[in-house]
């Protein structure tokens, strides 16, 4: 039988007590708890969140990368890349979001949590593929969505919208070939319709 969820404030206190000085920031907003930890404490904090009696987050439901470079003022002041995980305690009926920033923007690295939760395996590969975030200790960190010869990481904010290369099937060579992108860069601006009685408004 699943336990009745505790109040969000009680969960915040339980998580803060379990993590102690590993907590850099803890925010309770809209009844959702977000905990930020440093990259140095990330692996130990995640282990505590799984094993501490008041937490018992047995399941990692999601893990993704974030590029904060164009996110308001954050990109100009703080670290560029972060990893966000969503954890679930089935036995205690509670959830928490964990955020960790990569300390080096040029080579973003955080510890892998795939040894704690098997479900992190493909999530970390996806974050590596799309953002270039390296997960130290991952057994098989290789691309999962893009082609093996893909150049760059397509979810980074500085990745060109048209990409670097395109692939097509060459009927003469009877194989897939890679070529430089032939799409011309252009500004895409929505057309604004300005009519006096547009949409029935008078």
UniProtKB/Swiss-Prot annotation:
Catalytic EC class: translocase
A Gene Ontology molecular function term of the record: NADH dehydrogenase (ubiquinone) activity
| Subcellular location(s) per record | Cell inner membrane
Its EC number is: 7.1.1.-
Q: What superkingdom heads the lineage?
A: Bacteria
Pfam families attached here? Complex1_30kDa
Record-level GO cellular component terms:
plasma membrane
Q: Which reaction is recorded as catalysed by this protein? A: a quinone + NADH + 5 H(+)(in) = a quinol + NAD(+) + 4 H(+)(out)
In the bilayer, the protein is annotated as: Peripheral membrane protein
Q: What is its main location?
A: membrane
* UniProt KW Iron keyword: no
Alphabetized UniProt keyword annotations: Cell inner membrane, Cell membrane, Membrane, NAD, Quinone, Translocase, Transport, Ubiquinone
Query: Which InterPro entries does the entry link to?
Result: NADH_DH_suC, NADH_quin_OxRdtase_su_C/D-like, NADH_UbQ_OxRdtase_30kDa_su, NADH_UbQ_OxRdtase_CS
Its annotated function is as follows: NDH-1 shuttles electrons from NADH, via FMN and iron-sulfur (Fe-S) centers, to quinones in the respiratory chain. The immediate electron acceptor for the enzyme in this species is believed to be ubiquinone. Couples the redox reaction to proton translocation (for every two electrons transferred, four hydrogen ions are translocated across the cytoplasmic membrane), and thus conserves the redox energy in a proton gradient.
Its assembly, as annotated, is: NDH-1 is composed of 14 different subunits. Subunits NuoB, C, D, E, F, and G constitute the peripheral sector of the complex.
Q: Which NCBIfam families match?
A: NuoC_fam, PRK06074.1-1
| Family in the record | Belongs to the complex I 30 kDa subunit family.
Protein name as annotated: NADH-quinone oxidoreductase subunit C
The species this protein was found in: Paracidovorax citrulli (strain AAC00-1) (Acidovorax citrulli)
């Amino acid at each position: 039988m699943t336990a009745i969820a505790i109040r969000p404030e009680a969960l915040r206190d339980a998580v803060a007590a379990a993590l102690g000085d590993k907590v850099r920031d803890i925010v309770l907003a809209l009844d959702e708890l977000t905990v930020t930890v440093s990259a140095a404490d990330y692996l130990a904090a995640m282990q505590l969140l799984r094993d501490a009696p008041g937490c018992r987050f047995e399941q990692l439901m999601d893990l993704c990368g974030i590029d904060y470079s164009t996110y308001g003022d954050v990109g100009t002041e703080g670290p560029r890349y972060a990893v966000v995980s969503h954890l679930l305690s089935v036995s205690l009926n509670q959830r928490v979001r964990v955020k960790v920033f990569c300390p080096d923007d040029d080579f973003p690295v955080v510890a892998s949590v795939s040894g704690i939760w098997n479900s992190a395996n493909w999530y970390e590969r996806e974050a590596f593929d799309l953002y270039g975030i390296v997960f130290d200790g991952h057994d098989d960190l290789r691309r999962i969505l893009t082609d093996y010869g893909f150049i760059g990481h397509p979810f980074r904010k500085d990745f060109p919208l048209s990409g670097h290369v395109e692939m097509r099937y060459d009927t003469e060579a009877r194989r897939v070939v890679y070529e430089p992108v032939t799409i011309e860069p252009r500004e895409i601006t929505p057309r604004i319709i300005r009519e006096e009685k547009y949409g029935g408004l008078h």
